[in-house]
Curated annotation (Swiss-Prot):
PANTHER family: 3-DEOXY-MANNO-OCTULOSONATE CYTIDYLYLTRANSFERASE, 3-DEOXY-MANNO-OCTULOSONATE CYTIDYLYLTRANSFERASE, MITOCHONDRIAL
EC class (word): transferase
SUPFAM superfamilies cross-referenced by the UniProt entry: Nucleotide-diphospho-sugar transferases (SSF53448)
Gene expressing this chain: kdsB
Family: Belongs to the KdsB family.
EC number, UniProt record: 2.7.7.38
Domain of life from the UniProt record: Bacteria
Transmembrane regions listed in the UniProt entry: none
Listed name of the protein: 3-deoxy-manno-octulosonate cytidylyltransferase
GO CC aspect terms: cytosol
Record function comment: Activates KDO (a required 8-carbon sugar) for incorporation into bacterial lipopolysaccharide in Gram-negative bacteria.
Length: 257
Protein backbone atom coordinates (compact mmCIF):
# COMPACT_ATOMS: atom_id res chain seq x y z
CA UNK A 1 0.00 0.00 0.00
CA UNK A 2 1.16 3.60 -0.52
CA UNK A 3 2.92 5.47 2.26
CA UNK A 4 0.83 8.61 1.68
CA UNK A 5 -2.37 9.04 3.64
CA UNK A 6 -5.30 11.41 3.85
CA UNK A 7 -6.92 12.77 6.99
CA UNK A 8 -10.65 13.46 7.06
CA UNK A 9 -12.06 15.50 9.94
CA UNK A 10 -15.81 14.91 10.34
CA UNK A 11 -17.24 18.01 12.01
CA UNK A 12 -20.97 18.34 12.71
CA UNK A 13 -22.47 21.60 13.87
CA UNK A 14 -25.17 19.92 15.92
CA UNK A 15 -24.11 18.58 19.33
CA UNK A 16 -26.39 17.73 22.23
CA UNK A 17 -23.95 18.92 24.87
CA UNK A 18 -22.09 21.66 22.97
CA UNK A 19 -23.98 23.02 19.95
CA UNK A 20 -21.63 24.46 17.36
CA UNK A 21 -18.70 22.72 19.05
CA UNK A 22 -16.21 22.95 16.14
CA UNK A 23 -16.60 26.74 16.15
CA UNK A 24 -16.06 27.28 19.86
CA UNK A 25 -13.12 29.53 20.64
CA UNK A 26 -9.82 28.11 21.87
CA UNK A 27 -6.83 30.41 22.15
CA UNK A 28 -8.32 33.01 19.83
CA UNK A 29 -9.41 30.67 17.03
CA UNK A 30 -12.12 28.06 16.49
CA UNK A 31 -11.52 24.54 17.75
CA UNK A 32 -11.69 23.14 14.22
CA UNK A 33 -8.65 25.23 13.25
CA UNK A 34 -6.59 23.56 16.00
CA UNK A 35 -7.70 20.14 14.77
CA UNK A 36 -6.69 21.03 11.21
CA UNK A 37 -3.27 22.11 12.46
CA UNK A 38 -2.75 18.75 14.16
CA UNK A 39 -3.69 16.98 10.93
CA UNK A 40 -1.29 19.11 8.89
CA UNK A 41 1.50 18.45 11.39
CA UNK A 42 1.04 14.72 10.76
CA UNK A 43 2.18 15.18 7.17
CA UNK A 44 -0.98 13.99 5.46
CA UNK A 45 -1.05 14.30 1.68
CA UNK A 46 -4.49 15.90 1.99
CA UNK A 47 -6.67 17.12 4.85
CA UNK A 48 -10.43 17.27 4.30
CA UNK A 49 -12.93 18.84 6.70
CA UNK A 50 -16.23 17.03 6.12
CA UNK A 51 -19.06 19.06 7.61
CA UNK A 52 -22.79 19.56 7.40
CA UNK A 53 -22.66 23.32 7.99
CA UNK A 54 -21.31 26.15 5.85
CA UNK A 55 -20.15 28.05 8.94
CA UNK A 56 -17.64 25.31 9.74
CA UNK A 57 -16.43 25.29 6.14
CA UNK A 58 -15.94 29.06 6.32
CA UNK A 59 -13.99 28.73 9.58
CA UNK A 60 -11.20 26.79 7.85
CA UNK A 61 -11.06 29.06 4.81
CA UNK A 62 -7.47 30.22 4.47
CA UNK A 63 -5.99 27.00 5.86
CA UNK A 64 -4.35 24.54 3.44
CA UNK A 65 -7.24 22.09 3.80
CA UNK A 66 -10.26 21.14 1.70
CA UNK A 67 -13.71 21.85 3.14
CA UNK A 68 -16.53 19.65 1.88
CA UNK A 69 -20.23 20.00 2.67
CA UNK A 70 -21.68 16.55 3.28
CA UNK A 71 -25.15 15.18 3.90
CA UNK A 72 -26.81 15.88 7.23
CA UNK A 73 -28.35 12.46 7.83
CA UNK A 74 -25.17 10.48 8.54
CA UNK A 75 -25.43 8.41 11.72
CA UNK A 76 -21.67 8.42 12.34
CA UNK A 77 -18.42 10.05 11.35
CA UNK A 78 -17.45 6.87 9.52
CA UNK A 79 -20.43 7.23 7.20
CA UNK A 80 -19.38 10.83 6.54
CA UNK A 81 -15.89 9.59 5.62
CA UNK A 82 -17.40 7.09 3.23
CA UNK A 83 -19.28 9.86 1.45
CA UNK A 84 -16.06 11.84 1.07
CA UNK A 85 -14.19 8.80 -0.27
CA UNK A 86 -16.91 8.20 -2.84
CA UNK A 87 -17.18 11.81 -3.98
CA UNK A 88 -13.40 12.19 -4.22
CA UNK A 89 -13.18 8.88 -6.12
CA UNK A 90 -10.24 7.71 -4.02
CA UNK A 91 -8.62 4.47 -5.13
CA UNK A 92 -9.37 1.39 -3.02
CA UNK A 93 -5.94 1.38 -1.36
CA UNK A 94 -6.03 5.04 -0.28
CA UNK A 95 -5.32 5.26 3.46
CA UNK A 96 -7.84 7.47 5.25
CA UNK A 97 -7.42 8.57 8.88
CA UNK A 98 -10.53 9.67 10.77
CA UNK A 99 -9.68 12.54 13.15
CA UNK A 100 -12.65 13.80 15.13
CA UNK A 101 -13.35 17.53 15.02
CA UNK A 102 -13.21 17.81 18.82
CA UNK A 103 -9.60 16.60 19.24
CA UNK A 104 -7.56 19.84 19.32
CA UNK A 105 -4.65 18.25 21.22
CA UNK A 106 -4.23 15.03 19.25
CA UNK A 107 -0.59 13.99 18.90
CA UNK A 108 0.23 14.30 15.20
CA UNK A 109 2.85 11.56 15.48
CA UNK A 110 0.13 9.09 16.49
CA UNK A 111 -1.85 9.87 13.35
CA UNK A 112 1.13 9.15 11.14
CA UNK A 113 2.05 6.00 13.08
CA UNK A 114 -1.51 4.72 12.69
CA UNK A 115 -1.57 5.21 8.93
CA UNK A 116 1.89 3.72 8.47
CA UNK A 117 1.01 0.65 10.55
CA UNK A 118 -2.10 -0.04 8.46
CA UNK A 119 -0.10 0.43 5.27
CA UNK A 120 2.28 -2.33 6.34
CA UNK A 121 -0.45 -4.93 6.92
CA UNK A 122 -2.11 -7.00 4.23
CA UNK A 123 -4.53 -8.74 6.61
CA UNK A 124 -6.38 -5.67 7.95
CA UNK A 125 -8.21 -2.79 6.31
CA UNK A 126 -8.98 -0.93 9.54
CA UNK A 127 -6.61 0.18 12.30
CA UNK A 128 -6.92 1.96 15.63
CA UNK A 129 -4.80 2.78 18.70
CA UNK A 130 -4.53 1.48 22.27
CA UNK A 131 -2.45 2.49 25.28
CA UNK A 132 -1.62 0.64 28.52
CA UNK A 133 -3.88 1.13 31.53
CA UNK A 134 -1.80 1.94 34.59
CA UNK A 135 -4.52 2.82 37.12
CA UNK A 136 -6.58 -0.19 38.31
CA UNK A 137 -9.73 1.90 38.75
CA UNK A 138 -9.78 2.62 35.02
CA UNK A 139 -10.23 -1.09 34.33
CA UNK A 140 -13.69 -0.89 35.93
CA UNK A 141 -14.61 2.54 34.51
CA UNK A 142 -17.23 2.10 31.76
CA UNK A 143 -16.08 5.37 30.19
CA UNK A 144 -12.69 3.77 29.53
CA UNK A 145 -13.12 1.35 26.64
CA UNK A 146 -10.91 -1.72 26.91
CA UNK A 147 -9.59 -3.75 24.00
CA UNK A 148 -8.34 -7.35 23.89
CA UNK A 149 -6.17 -8.49 20.98
CA UNK A 150 -4.73 -11.67 19.55
CA UNK A 151 -1.02 -12.37 19.17
CA UNK A 152 -0.88 -10.34 15.95
CA UNK A 153 -2.42 -7.22 17.55
CA UNK A 154 -5.78 -7.79 15.88
CA UNK A 155 -8.80 -6.88 17.99
CA UNK A 156 -10.77 -9.71 19.53
CA UNK A 157 -13.22 -7.48 21.41
CA UNK A 158 -13.84 -3.96 22.68
CA UNK A 159 -15.81 -3.47 25.89
CA UNK A 160 -16.74 -1.00 28.60
CA UNK A 161 -16.47 -3.92 31.02
CA UNK A 162 -13.27 -5.17 32.67
CA UNK A 163 -11.78 -7.43 30.01
CA UNK A 164 -9.99 -9.70 30.32
CA UNK A 165 -11.63 -10.68 33.61
CA UNK A 166 -9.00 -11.69 36.16
CA UNK A 167 -10.87 -14.61 37.72
CA UNK A 168 -8.58 -15.01 40.72
CA UNK A 169 -7.94 -11.40 41.73
CA UNK A 170 -11.32 -9.88 40.88
CA UNK A 171 -13.33 -12.74 42.38
CA UNK A 172 -11.58 -12.14 45.69
CA UNK A 173 -12.56 -8.48 45.58
CA UNK A 174 -9.00 -7.22 45.33
CA UNK A 175 -9.78 -5.02 42.35
CA UNK A 176 -6.15 -5.23 41.25
CA UNK A 177 -5.19 -7.48 38.33
CA UNK A 178 -2.32 -9.92 38.38
CA UNK A 179 1.07 -8.30 37.68
CA UNK A 180 1.88 -8.25 33.99
CA UNK A 181 -1.72 -8.54 32.82
CA UNK A 182 -1.86 -6.33 29.68
CA UNK A 183 -4.93 -4.14 30.10
CA UNK A 184 -5.21 -1.57 27.33
CA UNK A 185 -7.53 1.34 26.73
CA UNK A 186 -8.85 2.05 23.28
CA UNK A 187 -8.01 5.42 21.72
CA UNK A 188 -10.82 6.28 19.33
CA UNK A 189 -8.83 7.25 16.25
CA UNK A 190 -9.17 5.07 13.15
CA UNK A 191 -7.52 4.53 9.80
CA UNK A 192 -9.26 2.76 6.93
CA UNK A 193 -8.63 1.85 3.36
CA UNK A 194 -11.07 3.60 1.05
CA UNK A 195 -12.28 0.17 -0.05
CA UNK A 196 -13.30 -0.64 3.51
CA UNK A 197 -15.19 2.62 3.91
CA UNK A 198 -17.23 1.59 0.87
CA UNK A 199 -17.91 -1.78 2.49
CA UNK A 200 -18.75 -0.30 5.89
CA UNK A 201 -21.79 1.66 4.72
CA UNK A 202 -23.40 -1.60 3.58
CA UNK A 203 -22.93 -3.39 6.92
CA UNK A 204 -25.96 -3.85 9.14
CA UNK A 205 -25.63 -2.58 12.73
CA UNK A 206 -24.94 -5.36 15.21
CA UNK A 207 -26.55 -6.24 18.56
CA UNK A 208 -23.17 -5.89 20.28
CA UNK A 209 -22.68 -2.29 19.22
CA UNK A 210 -26.15 -1.43 20.52
CA UNK A 211 -25.47 -3.02 23.91
CA UNK A 212 -21.99 -1.54 24.39
CA UNK A 213 -22.64 1.65 22.41
CA UNK A 214 -19.40 0.99 20.50
CA UNK A 215 -19.62 1.42 16.75
CA UNK A 216 -16.40 -0.52 16.06
CA UNK A 217 -18.06 -3.76 17.18
CA UNK A 218 -19.99 -3.73 13.91
CA UNK A 219 -16.72 -4.42 12.11
CA UNK A 220 -15.87 -7.43 14.28
CA UNK A 221 -19.45 -8.73 14.16
CA UNK A 222 -19.22 -8.99 10.39
CA UNK A 223 -15.95 -10.92 10.55
CA UNK A 224 -13.56 -8.14 9.56
CA UNK A 225 -10.27 -7.45 11.33
CA UNK A 226 -9.12 -4.33 13.15
CA UNK A 227 -5.40 -3.80 13.66
CA UNK A 228 -4.68 -2.36 17.12
CA UNK A 229 -1.51 -0.26 17.12
CA UNK A 230 0.07 -0.09 20.60
CA UNK A 231 1.27 3.31 21.82
CA UNK A 232 2.79 4.30 25.13
CA UNK A 233 0.41 7.01 26.24
CA UNK A 234 -3.05 8.32 25.43
CA UNK A 235 -3.34 11.84 23.97
CA UNK A 236 -5.07 14.60 25.88
CA UNK A 237 -8.83 13.97 25.89
CA UNK A 238 -11.13 15.61 23.39
CA UNK A 239 -13.81 18.21 24.09
CA UNK A 240 -17.28 16.81 24.72
CA UNK A 241 -18.75 18.94 27.51
CA UNK A 242 -18.61 22.51 28.80
CA UNK A 243 -16.23 21.31 31.52
CA UNK A 244 -13.98 19.78 28.85
CA UNK A 245 -13.97 23.10 27.02
CA UNK A 246 -12.83 25.01 30.10
CA UNK A 247 -10.14 22.42 30.76
CA UNK A 248 -8.95 22.74 27.16
CA UNK A 249 -8.78 26.51 27.48
CA UNK A 250 -6.74 26.24 30.66
CA UNK A 251 -4.45 23.69 29.01
CA UNK A 252 -3.91 25.95 26.01
CA UNK A 253 -3.30 29.09 28.06
CA UNK A 254 -0.73 27.22 30.13
CA UNK A 255 1.05 26.05 27.01
CA UNK A 256 0.96 29.35 25.11
CA UNK A 257 2.98 32.38 26.30
Amino acid sequence: MPADFTIVIPARYGSTRLPGKPLLELGGKPMIAHVCERALEAGAAEVVVATDDARIAEAVDGLPVTAMLTRTEHASGTERLAEVAERRAWSDDTLVVNLQGDEPFMDAALLRALAEALGRREDCRVATLAAPIHRPEEIFDPNVVKVVTDGENRALYFSRAAVPWDRESFAEGAGVPMPGMPYRRHIGVYAYTASYLRRYVDLEPSPLEHVERLEQLRILWHGDRILVVPVEGAPAPGVDTAADLERARRHLSGRTP
